[in-house]
Each structure stands twice: as C-alpha cells, then as structure tokens.
Amino acid sequence: MTVEISKVFVLMMLNLFLGASSSIWSVAPAAFQLPPCQLINQTVSLEKEGCPRCHAVETTICSGHCLTKDPIIKIPFSNVYQHVCTYRDLFYKTFEFPDCPPGVDPVVTYPVALSCHCSRCVMDTSDCTFESLQPDFCMNDIPFYY
C-alpha cells in the first residue's frame, strides 16, 4: 500500500513540476505568426565622411523572429539571453563613391549576408537595439541649422 502511495505521489510531483516548468517559460501566442529568421533583400544607404551624397545599394540582411522565452519567475543571479536574428555567414562588398573630393578615400565596405540564424547578439557586428535607424537612412539628408 505504501509503495503504491509513493508511486502516485512521485507521479503527481513529476506532473506538477513539468506543468509548472512549462508555465515558467511562456511564449507569446503571436510569436508563431511572425516571419522566421531569414535572408531578405534590403536597400541600404552608404555614406562616407567627406563625400557629399549617400548612395543606395541592394544587399541581403538577416531579418525575422527568433523564438525567445522570458521567465515569468525570475531566478536571482541567473542570466537570460535573448536571441536575435543575426548573420551566420557573410562577406564584405566594396563600393567606390563617384563624387568624393580629392584627398578623400572614396572606398567603403558593407556586409552581405549569406545565411542567418538565431543567436545572441554580437554588438561588434550587429545593431540589436529596440529601435535603431532604418537601413536606408542617410545623415546627409538631415538639414543642419547654423
């Protein structure tokens, strides 16, 4: 009799633990309707200090949703890493500005994504801020008042 009660108790505790652990890490229902992390074509504005105009180029970037879990119950001293859609493989292309004045190096390089994946943000190579500048934004388009 005690063996059966202990089996039932263990099964109830296991069920309680598994049920609770799934509710600790909740996923928003809308997350499954967002586009996944993938390559997309994007127009990007290139600019170079000393050159008068921006130039638009077509490139591939990583964009989309990565499934991320945020714990409802916060555990002290534990790290929660949010995953972002970022480059897996990339190469750099070179562009030469046609209208730079003499003495200004007209060459600039920009990344072209070859593949993407969900990973922690590497701030050295990616902009993982919540609201960053749009890829086709150009500083030269902002009027300066002196």
Swiss-Prot record:
InterPro entries xrefs: Cystine-knot_cytokine, Glyco_hormone_CN, Gonadotropin_bsu, Gonadotropin_bsu_CS
UniProtKB keywords: Disulfide bond, Glycoprotein, Hormone, Secreted, Signal
SUPFAM superfamilies in UniProt: Cystine-knot cytokines
Superkingdom, taxonomy of origin: Eukaryota
GO molecular function, one term: hormone activity
A biological process term (GO) from this entry: ovulation
Principal localisation: secreted
N-terminal signal peptide: 1-22
Described function: Involved in gametogenesis and steroidogenesis.
Subunit-structure text: Heterodimer of an alpha and a beta chain.
UniProt record similarity statement: Belongs to the glycoprotein hormones subunit beta family.
Protein name per Swiss-Prot or TrEMBL: Gonadotropin subunit beta-2
Provenance organism: Trichopodus trichopterus (Three spot gourami)
